[in-house]
Amino acid sequence: TIPMVAQQPDARDILDRAADAFRREGGVKITFSVRAPEGNTNGSIRLKGDKFLLETEGVTTWFDGRTQWSYLASSDEVNVSEPTPEELQSINPYSWLSLYKQDYKLKVAKTGNASDDTAYKVVMNATKRSQDMQCIILYIEKGSFRPLKLSMVQRGSKDAAVVFINSYQTGKNYDDSLFVFDRKAYPTAELVDLR
């Protein structure tokens, strides 16, 4: 008899399954910690399709799929823009859901520790020097295909920003209005239209 060996899925298959799992889960709320060269921060992101509400220390960002509003508490100012997919990469840690299908070379790597049994390590290297994110490393839980951690290196930088997923709640029923800036909630804020 021939011993059966479990086939290791390839990087694209892992990311396809992770993206599919994310889309099936409806509204998602994630809390996270970021360790970056410019400092550490904590935050949360609520996602529904391509919409998100990102809250970090001092900054709240709404994105309705087209328009983005970023509120800076320190200046009581809201910047309004229509970001390109490239600009969204540096704002939304979940932009990899659409990025991996183009302009990135994918591979599965060993995690180098005991988590090899519980997580896939997928390395995404940009194929174009113009890509804002030159390298993204995703640790994806086997079974659920949920991201556990991601590491990102931007163009022109040697240092990675590492995002640790602290909690991942699914099945949230978010109204589309959650992803749009509510002027009434910030009556004194100055709007700066960058469109």
Predicted regions and their residues:
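Envelope-exposed proteins and targeting segments
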Residues: 26-28, 41, 50, 57-59, ...
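An acidic-aromatic
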Residues: 42-91, 154-161
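Gly/Pro-enriched, hydrophobic low-complexity segments
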Residues: 104-187, 192-194
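Flexible, processing/modification-adjacent segments and terminal tails
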Residues: 7-27, 33-36, 64-134, 193-195
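An N-terminal domain-cap segment
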Residues: 32-45
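Short, charged low-complexity intrinsically disordered segments located at boundaries
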Residues: 43-53, 97-99, 168-170, 194-195
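C-terminal segment of classical bacterial N-terminal signal peptides
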Residues: 1-5
